[in-house]
Amino acid sequence: MHLNIILLEASLELVPKEIVNHPAVIKNAKRRNKKPEDTLLDISLHYHAMKYLENSHKRGRPDILHQALLVILTDPVIKGDIFIHTIQSKIIKVNPNMRPPKNYLRFIGLMEQLLKYGKIPINGDETLMEVTNLTLDNIVNRYDLILLSEKGEKINPEEICKLDEKWLLGIGAFPHGDFSDKILNLAKKIYSISGFPLETQQVLCRIFSACNSILGWP
């Protein structure tokens, strides 16, 4: 079954320059023998430093992306184009054959490498993830964007499984708040698959379970 997915406003970024000299940032970087600007922003490590950042409520949660990619990339049946749109508006193309590390610390190291060098692996025949020159506008010119939001029109998850290849399913990968106005305006349709707020991995699990059920749990 083919399903195109973009994880939107993902909380994935290197420590921004505004807080690169904060003691919490420096302490973590020294412990890992890295430059502060080469480490990933993580609210569990940089909580006090992040108080000074704009939109801090949507930032510093790379664990959300980690959990989402584990669901998407380990399903043997559901395949399609996979993109990540970060909180800093970077567009990352994900190879559907990638197997993300299950260990969170290994994932963090991989994402730091990706954001520093632009792709992983740095050298190799097959690129697993790459920071592209695309914009979100470029992406929605290729596909019709559907957003999943608790404010959308209520549908059953099975309806998502019936989408053809022209559609791109947009799922938020940030901890709090709503999609930006720009993203809401780019969407052709906005749906909800639950009467309750769901976390990113819960949304994906419901959809992937519904799609596998339609296929008879192959």
Curated annotation (Swiss-Prot):
Question: Which sequence ranges form a coiled-coil region, renumbered to this chain?
Answer: none
Q: Which reaction does it catalyse?
A: a pseudouridine in rRNA + S-adenosyl-L-methionine = an N(1)-methylpseudouridine in rRNA + S-adenosyl-L-homocysteine + H(+)
Q: Where is this site: Interaction with substrate rRNA?
A: 61, 99, 102, 106
Q: Which GO terms describe its biological process?
A: rRNA base methylation
> What EC number(s) are associated with this protein in UniProt?
2.1.1.-
Which class of enzymes does this protein belong to?
transferase
Site residues (Stabilizes Arg-61), renumbered to this chain: 63
The record's GO molecular-function terms, alphabetically, read:
rRNA (pseudouridine) methyltransferase activity; rRNA binding
Q: Which residues bind S-adenosyl-L-methionine?
A: 172, 177, 193-198
Could you name the domain of life of the organism this protein comes from? Archaea
This protein's UniProt keywords: Methyltransferase, Ribosome biogenesis, RNA-binding, rRNA processing, rRNA-binding, S-adenosyl-L-methionine, Transferase
Tell me the protein family, please.
Belongs to the class IV-like SAM-binding methyltransferase superfamily. RNA methyltransferase NEP1 family.
Its biological function?
Methyltransferase involved in ribosomal biogenesis. Specifically catalyzes the N1-methylation of the pseudouridine corresponding to position 914 in M.jannaschii 16S rRNA.
Q: How does it assemble?
A: Homodimer.
Its recorded name reads Ribosomal RNA small subunit methyltransferase Nep1
Q: Which source organism does the UniProt entry give?
A: Saccharolobus solfataricus (strain ATCC 35092 / DSM 1617 / JCM 11322 / P2)
